Regions:
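N-terminal glycine-rich anion-binding loop in soluble enzyme alpha/beta folds
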Residues: 1-38
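Conserved active-site and cofactor/substrate-binding residues in soluble primary-metabolism enzymes
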Residues: 14, 18, 40, 44, ...
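Anionic-ligand-binding alpha/beta catalytic cores of soluble enzymes and soluble regulatory domains
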Residues: 108-192
Length: 261
């Protein structure tokens, strides 16, 4: 069973090893794939969940995610309580299990065939993704009848922010929540892009490499998926050919607003 683990532990962090080990106790045949996202970045986690989950996957694929900033209640929390564990089943057959925090389920809420709460405690450990959730995730993966709770209302999940940085890839390309519309794109047009305190000129194009070396492109990237109505969304990327757009804009965090002029 392919199990994608999307979490904000940090690449190479001991936490990934501990979580993999604990899940494997309950799912011995699991094949883990680790995808780190920045600390507390539910938008990056949500983007990764959709990009992985809404494309063809091996039968039985599971996405287990944990980005839990515990921002659902600002008061002191007894017993290390935090956001609850939730479940989604996608049209691809991929099952998603993880904390319903921030934007974690935002990119899939309107596509999911099923949204349910998991029948799991939301407290009991500072490290719930190791000590509490693996057993619950395994119960869901194995189809145990008592593993799921009530339906989760998609309207209670926030929509993704518009015109924001969603994810930064290893090349420093900035994947955004700006949807590509071929009817509105005029290749070659020069625009000004501002993120936080940094502002740079970019060239609008229909492909990232359609600009000279050293130029910044505003173009449809490699990320996107099929929506409920059968249409396909592709997300705009900021791509610095031969460099890092992330560094150019002073390393903006996922969630940063992208202003276009």
């Amino acid at each position: 069973m392919l199990v994608h683990i999307i979490a904000d532990y940090g690449m190479g962090d001991l936490a990934f090893a501990e979580v993999v080990q604990r899940i494997k106790v309950h799912l011995p045949d699991m094949e883990p794939v680790l995808t780190p996202v920045p600390a507390y970045s539910t938008i990056a986690a949500g983007f990764c969940i959709a990009q992985i989950g809404l494309h063809p996957s091996p039968p039985g694929t599971l996405i287990y995610h944990n980005v839990a900033p515990r921002e659902d209640d600002p008061a002191a929390r007894a017993h290390n309580a935090g956001e609850r564990l939730a479940y989604a089943r996608l049209p691809t057959g991929v099952r998603v299990i993880g904390v319903n925090a921030g934007y974690a389920f935002s990119f899939i809420k309107d596509v999911a065939e099923k949204l349910r709460w998991a029948a799991s405690s939301a407290e009991g450990s500072q490290f719930r993704s190791r000590d509490v959730f693996p057993q619950a995730a395994a119960a869901i993966a194995l189809g145990l009848p008592a593993a799921l709770g009530h339906d989760l209302d998609p309207e209670s999940i926030p929509s993704p922010p518009v015109s924001a940085v969603a994810y930064v890839d290893g090349y420093g390309n900035l994947k955004t929540t700006i949807a590509y519309d071929p009817n509105r794109v005029r290749p070659g047009k020069r625009i000004t892009v501002r993120i936080n305190e940094r502002q740079h000129e970019a060239t609008v194009s229909d492909g990232a490499f359609a600009v000279p070396h050293g130029e910044l492109a505003f173009a449809p990237g490699s990320s996107g998926w099929t929506l409920r109505d059968g249409s396909t969304v592709r997300w705009i990327e900021l791509f610095l050919r031969g460099g890092s757009a992330w560094n150019l804009f002073d390393r903006p965090a996922p969630g940063s607003f992208v202003a276009i002029h």
